[in-house]
Amino acid sequence: MPYDRRQAKSILTDIGMDFNSYHACPNDCILFRHEYRDTTECPKCGKSRYRQDVQGDRVPAKVFPIIPRIRTMFKCKRIASLMHWHKNSRSTDNVMRVPADSPAWKHIEEKWEDFKSEPCNIRFGLAMDGVNPFGLCSSTWSTWPICLVNYNLPPWLAIKKGHILLSLIVLGKYKVKSMDVYLQPLVGATL
């Protein structure tokens, strides 16, 4: 067990589980990253990046880079061999049992033939839900974990604790107005 936060972060970094923090506009217009990294006001709405009062502090969103975690999955021979399950091992009796049997999946495969032709291309499902970590109805604190479910894996593994990837945590004292801006780092990494 690590002795403190710094040592814990060092251990996580060594195994490819590092994270990045990004400040967000108070109106959820942009993340202050890339070209906006050094700006102090939102270019869309003009709001200051920093609040003057102590009551409304926003904690930066924590983004967990997904590419190192995908590499780790493919380094494990057992998991790497199961990444083809949706292509090679699922039943073909036209009964919908897993997402790969759905009309939406079939539509995606018809629309993007190149994506379909490579069975190692990863199909992710996005799961997110706001929670109140302190269990108080009157609390204004909001926590939004955003997870990815790997639909390439068999269904009995895809939703197991070790295979769901936490990709982003949005923390703050207020409900998020628009989640799209927070998904930009994830979408950018996976395309």
Can you name each region flagged by the protein language model?
Residues 1-191:
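Long, charged/polar, flexible scaffold/linker tracts and peripheral helical/loop segments
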